[in-house]
Structure formats: C-alpha cells, structure tokens
C-alpha cells in the first residue's frame, strides 16, 4: 500500500474514532442491572481482547454467540472450552460445538454458566446466616444458511435457567431468540446486523416465596439491536459494532465496541480493543495438535468498571 493510500486509511480511522467519542454519550452501564447481564458480558478471549464487537466478525470459538449468521460460514467442526477468572467471587465458564452442514448451512450448540459464590447472608439484625451462591445457565441452539456465497442469515433459540438462594433456592426459566445476517462484501470488508434477546425473559413464580399472595412475574431482558463491521486495510483487522439497547418503552442505552488484531509472525496474534472505553488486550497462539493448525489458545486481559478490577479469560479451540 502506498503512502497516499496509507494516509487515507489513517484519516478514516481518526474520523471513525472521533464519531465514536461524540456519539458514545450513554453508557451500557444503564442496563447492567437488568436480567440477562451475564449474556452481555462476553465469551471468548479472542473476541473480548478486541472489545467484543463481533457483530460482523467470525469467532470460531463460539460463532453463534455474537451473531447466529456466523455459523453459515463454518468450514470445519469446532469444539471450544473457555473460562473467565473474574474478581468479586464471580465466574463464567462455557463450552460450544459447531459444524458445517453441506452444502451451505451451519449448526452450533453452546452452554454458558455464570454465577456468584460466597454471598454473605445476614438476617434482619445483621447476624450472619451463612454463605450463599447464585447461578445462571443459557443454552444456545444456532442455525444459519447462506442465501448466496456472500450473505448468511441465522437464528439462535436460547433457553435460560436461573437459581437464587431464596427460600431454599428458587429457580426460574425462560427463552429468547436472536436473528441476524452477515454480508461479506469483499476480503477487506464485512458487514453484520443482529437483533438479540428478542422476547427474552425469566418467568418467576413468587408464590414460592409469598405463598398464596404470590403471582407470576416476568423479568425481561433488554433487547439489543446491533450493527457492525470488519475492515482489513492491510496486515491487521479492525473490528467494531454499535449496540442500541431497548427495555420496554422507557429505558434505553447504547454501547460502542472497537478493536483490532495484528499478526506479527505466523500463528501469533496480538490484539487490543475497547468496550465503552474500557480497554482490553490479548494474544493468541495457533498450533498443530492432530493435524496442521487445528488448535488455538487465546488469552484476554479485560479491565472492568470502577471497583471490578481485572478479568482473565482463556479459550481453547480445537478444529477437526
């Protein structure tokens, strides 16, 4: 790429970052307290090290998580395990499997488990009553099909389960749907769009707590509407997306995520990104286990919001 082309790329990047700064006024912290927050945290080290804005990008570790249309571009069968080492006695672990369905489709299944341990229980007088824990599960079923070589449409069906340490551990169940598409315009540009957590909610029966005075309560997830891109100007990738969150008719928020990956040498990847101006960095190593370049180990270091500290994310992917 010549000096003129390089300067134009740098100018476009500067303009884009300026737009991000001007429009990212509302923080996604506004929806942090609503149901399903563990699904908005992120999954693989690969994606989180670049800010997590993978609406248009392909994440082989969990292709259906960010956009179900991604599984339409699978070329192999992938199995993935990941672990988040989180502060404040929190945890998140996940596993997924995905495969190509000839001639033009893909299928994926994944499970996410998150929770909090060592919750200090107290009675009305302040006396300690013990340590408690809470946990949530989400099962993803993803399917996508390429309408043409460059366009894939996909859908996720998600099943939720949550357990709270109230009255001997009560639980709730729920479902949700995602739908999206990805357009691979060229080897240098990809675009994506997804609606996530449509009609997603937990259904609680408060009669388990208040006996005959209880009722059925629906705890809705904020719906996400996202648009994203992948741009490859040279020896590195630029990945990002914009998310609009909608909760009923009254609560809304937004989020910008942006990151990049550079390959300094074969099979070595260096990454960095931001998620609403919270930085993250990471790296990846691809190697041969059973066949050439069939395994990858990724790591991400993520800075949380004030008071949260650092999170360490490890992901292992095997293609077969």
Go through each PLM region and give its residues.
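Generic intrinsically disordered, low-complexity segments enriched for polar/acidic and small residues
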Residues: 13, 18-20, 38, 62, ...
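N-terminal periplasmic accessory domains that precede
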Residues: 62-73
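A generic alpha-helix propensity feature with a strong bias for hydrophobic helices
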Residues: 3, 71, 105-106
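Outer-membrane beta-barrel porins/channels
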Residues: 29-51, 55-57, 76-79, 84, ...
């Amino acid at each position: 790429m010549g000096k003129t082309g390089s300067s134009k790329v740098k100018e476009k990047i500067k303009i884009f970052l300026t737009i991000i700064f001007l429009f990212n006024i509302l923080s996604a912290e506004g929806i942090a307290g609503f149901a399903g927050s563990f699904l908005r945290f992120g999954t693989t080290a690969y994606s989180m090290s670049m800010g997590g804005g993978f609406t248009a990008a392909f994440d082989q570790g969990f292709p259906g998580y960010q956009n179900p249309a991604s599984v339409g571009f699978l070329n192999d069968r992938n199995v993935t395990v990941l672990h988040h080492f989180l502060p404040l006695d929190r945890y998140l672990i996940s596993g997924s499997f995905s495969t190509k369905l000839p001639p033009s489709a893909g299928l994926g299944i994944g499970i996410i488990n998150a929770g909090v341990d060592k919750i200090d229980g107290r009675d009305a007088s302040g006396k300690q009553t013990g340590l408690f824990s809470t946990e949530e599960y989400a099962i993803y079923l993803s399917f996508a099909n390429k309408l043409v070589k460059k366009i894939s449409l996909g859908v996720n069906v998600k099943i939720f389960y949550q357990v709270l340490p109230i009255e001997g551990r009560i639980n709730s169940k729920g479902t949700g749907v995602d739908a999206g598409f990805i357009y691979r315009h060229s080897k240098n540009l990809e675009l994506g769009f997804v609606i996530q957590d449509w009609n997603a909610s937990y259904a609680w029966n408060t009669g388990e707590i208040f006996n005959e005075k209880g009722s059925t309560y629906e705890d809705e997830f904020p719906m996400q509407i996202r648009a994203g891109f992948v741009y490859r100007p040279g020896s590195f990738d630029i990945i990002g997306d914009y998310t609009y969150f909608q909760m009923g008719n009254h609560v809304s928020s937004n989020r910008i995520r942006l990151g990049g990956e550079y390959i300094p040498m074969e099979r070595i990847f260096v990454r960095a990104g931001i998620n609403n101006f919270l930085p993250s960095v990471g790296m990846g190593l691809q190697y041969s286990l059973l066949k050439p370049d069939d395994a990858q180990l990724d790591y991400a270091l993520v800075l949380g919001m004030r008071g949260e500290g650092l999170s360490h994310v490890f992901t292992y992917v095997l293609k077969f």
